UniProtKB/Swiss-Prot annotation:
Gene3D superfamilies to which the protein is assigned, alphabetical: 3.30.70.120, Periplasmic binding protein-like II
Subcellular location as annotated: Cytoplasm
Catalytic activity: 1-(5-phospho-beta-D-ribosyl)-ATP + diphosphate = 5-phospho-alpha-D-ribose 1-diphosphate + ATP
Protein name stated in the entry: ATP phosphoribosyltransferase
Signal sequence extent: none
Gene Ontology, cellular component aspect: cytoplasm
């Protein structure tokens, strides 16, 4: 591939999605070394360049066709799309799939002493946020008038600092809210990391590479969600045992040497095999039960 047809992928330079994005690409066989002083990392084994940028720059880079793919939180993507639509800028991209990391929620929160009934309790109050567009859309849907206080960070300190009456911010565990004397009242948006593609047409070789990377991502995500189960089972309870395996489709059943009354079962399960299920399997005569993670899947 020439320099102009190398695949360009934008990922977060630092922050909660940065390491997971790099880990995902490496799991897909993309080899690269990141120099913290440089914003571009070139793959050692594929015609791929990684651009390490601010997360809120990623949607625009994809929508403007500067990069081909981006890994970004859905909250940032939606916020930027609303902003660009209001300004008449290109706001289209293709969401290829959600990923299995970066889960969070955008929530309203108020001080512990605030007597909150419902969203109308915020009528006329000042709300601090880094997501003014998502907040505005929600409040308009609820028919609530409010005043916004735009902050780029440390939103949770705004009420204590006298800047706002409440906040609208990302929440993962709620520990940060609790530490700042706040409690969550409404979830206005749920978000995961996702991979997006530019709507610009691609040369055949570049699109083929995009398809290959997406296929590998699908395999990596499926593998994380699955377990490989091996066990020995009596033939007389075989149907009951197979029925207990969560999410298993068409398990492989093999005869055991010198034992016509027992078989070996191999299965891929897309759900967790909990201890109580394993105990039920044991009660049905299953033995040598192994539950193992899967590194990669395809097909």
């Amino acid at each position: 591939m020439s320099e102009s047809t190398r695949l360009r992928i934008a990922i977060q330079k630092s922050g909660r999605l940065s390491k997971e994005s790099q880990k995902l690409l490496k799991s897909c066989g993309v080899k690269f070394n990141v120099n913290e002083q440089r914003l571009i990392a070139h793959s050692d084994n594929m015609p791929i360049d990684l651009l390490r940028v601010r997360d809120d720059d990623i949607p625009g880079l994809v929508m403007d066709g500067v990069v081909d793919l981006g890994i970004i939180g859905e909250n940032v993507l939606e916020e930027e799309q609303i902003e660009r639509q209001s300004l008449g800028k290109p706001a289209e991209c293709v969401k290829l799939r959600e990923l299995d990391f970066g889960a969070c929620r955008l929530s309203l929160a108020v001080p512990n002493e605030f007597e909150y009934q419902d969203a109308s309790s915020l009528e006329g109050l000042r709300i601090a946020t880094s997501y003014p567009n998502l907040l505005r859309r929600y409040m308009q849907e609820q028919g609530i008038n409010y005043r916004d206080c735009m902050l780029k960070g440390s939103v949770e300190v705004a009420p204590r600092a006298g800047l706002s009456d409440g906040i609208c911010d990302l929440v993962s565990t709620g520990a940060t809210l609790e530490a700042n004397g706040l409690y969550e009242t409404e979830v206005i948006y749920r978000s995961m990391a996702c991979i997006i593609q530019s709507t610009q047409s691609q040369p055949d070789d570049k699109q083929a590479l995009i398809n290959k990377i997406l296929s590998r991502i699908n395999g990596v995500v499926r593998a994380k969600e699955s377990k490989y189960i091996l066990l020995h089972a009596p033939t007389e309870t075989l149907e009951q045992i197979v029925a207990l395996l969560p999410g298993a489709e068409n398990p492989t059943v093999l005869p055991l040497n010198d034992d016509t009354n027992r078989v070996a079962i191999h299965a891929v399960s897309t759900e967790d095999l909990f201890w109580d299920t394993m105990e039920q399997l044991t009660q049905l005569g299953a033995s040598s039960i192994l539950v193992m993670p899967i590194e990669k899947m395809m097909g």
